[in-house]
Every structure is written in structure tokens, then in C-alpha cells.
Amino acid sequence: MLSCLLRNDKRLEVFFSSLDMKKSYLLALSGGSDSLFLLYLLKSRGVSFIAVHVDYGWRESSYREAEELELRCQAEGVPIIVDHVPPEYRTSRDQENAARRYRYALFHKVCQKKNLSGIFLAHHANDQAETVLKRVLEGAHLSNLKGMRGEVYYEGIPILRPLLHIPKIVLSRTLDAANIHYVHDITNTDERYLRARMRNKIFPWLEEIFGKNITQPLLTLAQDSEELSCYMKQQAQPFLEKIRKENTTLSLEIPKTLIEQVFLTKWVCKEFFYSAGIVASRHFLQTVYDHLNRGLPAQMRLRNKRVIVKAGVVMIE
């Protein structure tokens, strides 16, 4: 059943048809249904990889689970590295981010040492939906609701997420049908962590209120956001190419035809400020636009820079 399902997934077919099968990769293996599914997927496709398991020691059973994973990988003919996190790394006030930084640094180190060409992560559709909803509630820009990307780079090494379109229930049911045992990590339900609260409370509540699954609409929103971001970059590029630099002053012409397009004007200004190492808030961008639209000169401070707005031009000193 496992191989039959995976062979019928066209997005996976596209992914693996473009993967360089001559190279070797790293698989982040937690032992949960997601990463075990990915292990068997990579194995069934003939991908050469090394599994890396990070034991944070957060659960009493974690050491035994790490040993069981080693035995499973040995039985499957998959090389595995098990890393037990030192106690001093477990006391951070922000355990989620501290753990993430630790494992990414470890993955990077292993890739360099073993000459591996990418890191496989088993994030799935539900993880993606959680990311998008979190960004919506945090007030992210429309172009930044795109969630996790299928391929990004960390310190020059590709991060590969081929399961982003597959719901978690599909992964777990497929393993259940094949009688493949996996770990149920209780930290995934520990509501001290935001992700667990979203997973256990917010999503079920929203779906109960709406009477429908909200994962797919959030994935659609992420796709729309990705497309919007690409489109806006294309539209903004002709204007950004006209940035001028005189000594330490950057200037950008904002023609009337651009000012008539509010969204694009603010996007161009945002990218202009970003090129100078400045992240501008929505309020600041709106203020700049209001002065441009009304033809009113202004001088404002943004971080350690001075922003000057004149008729049809924005300058950064």
C-alpha cells in the first residue's frame, strides 16, 4: 500500500524526477510518523541518505526510543547518527528555538563532514497550515503568508521538504496499514508550546465553528501569497533598478504613474529601504506614501538613517 500510494502522487513524482540521485543526503529522523514515512519514501525511491536523530532528553523514554531507531535503521540498511543533546542545552527559556538552532547546526556539521548534498525534513500539510495561520494572526504582510517552502537553503545547504502537500493523517494511516510502528511524541501535545496549542485547541475549535476542514484553504492562501510575492517582485524591479547612490545618499524616483498604485508604491519603498538594511513598518510605509501622494516634503528617522521625502523622490541618508 505504501509504494502504491506514493507512486500515484504526481507532486512527489515531479520532485523525485528533479532530484540528483547521484548524490547523498541527510534525513532528519525523529521517529514520529512524519519522518518515518519520509524514511521509507526515500528508501523506496533509491535515494542514498544518512539518518540523523537528535535526542533532546525531554522525555524519560527518549533514550530508549533512540536505541530502537538505531535498531530499525540497521534492519533497513540505513546509516544513522544519534546525537544526545548535552544537559546545558536543555535549560533554555525558549526551548523550541534553542532546539531548532542546535539541530540545524548539527545537520550542517554532518553534511559538511559526510559530503551530503541536502537535508530532508518531514514537514507536512498540517505543519504548513499551522505556519500560515500563525503568520496571519501575527499580522504578516500578504506576500509573507506563503509558509514553508519546499526548498530553501541553510548556510548554503538545501533544505528539502517534499511532504508539504500531504496531510499528516495520510502519513500515519499509511504506516498503520503497513504495520509500521512509530513514536508518539508527547511533547507535540505539550501546551506550553504554541504549536501544540494551535494543533490541539485552535485548529479543532475553528473547524468545529466553521464545520469544515481549514487546512486546505490555508494551503491555498500560502500558494496565493507565494504567487503574489513573485508578481510584486517582477512589477517592482523596473523601479528599483533606478536606485541612485551619491556618496552616502541613496535616492529613488517615484513617478506619478507609480503613486497611483498604492500597493505597488509601498512595496517598492519597502524594498528600497530593505536594500539599505532597513526594515520599515506598515505605519512608516503608509506615512511615506501619504507624503508622496500629497506632494508634501518630510524628513523622518528610521533606525539610524534619515529618510527624506520630496515630490516624486525618496532619499535615505
UniProtKB/Swiss-Prot annotation:
Catalytic activity: cytidine(34) in tRNA(Ile2) + L-lysine + ATP = lysidine(34) in tRNA(Ile2) + AMP + diphosphate + H(+)
GO molecular function: ATP binding; tRNA(Ile)-lysidine synthase activity
Superkingdom: Bacteria
Locations listed in the record: Cytoplasm
Location (main, coarse): cytoplasm
InterPro entries to which the protein is assigned, alphabetical: Rossmann-like_a/b/a_fold (IPR014729), TilS/TtcA_N (IPR011063), tRNA_Ile_lys_synt (IPR012094), tRNA_Ile_lys_synt_N (IPR012795)
Gene3D superfamilies: HUPs (3.40.50.620)
EC nos: 6.3.4.19
Cellular component annotations (GO), alphabetically ordered: cytoplasm
Residue sites binding ATP per the record: S30, G31, G32, S33, D34, S35
Gene Ontology biological-process entries: tRNA modification
Keywords: ATP-binding, Cytoplasm, Ligase, Nucleotide-binding, tRNA processing
Keyword tRNA processing: yes
A Pfam family: ATP_bind_3
Family affiliation: Belongs to the tRNA(Ile)-lysidine synthase family.
Cross-referenced NCBIfam families: lysidine_TilS_N
Record note on domains: The N-terminal region contains the highly conserved SGGXDS motif, predicted to be a P-loop motif involved in ATP binding.
Protein's job: Ligates lysine onto the cytidine present at position 34 of the AUA codon-specific tRNA(Ile) that contains the anticodon CAU, in an ATP-dependent manner. Cytidine is converted to lysidine, thus changing the amino acid specificity of the tRNA from methionine to isoleucine.
Name of the protein this chain belongs to: tRNA(Ile)-lysidine synthase
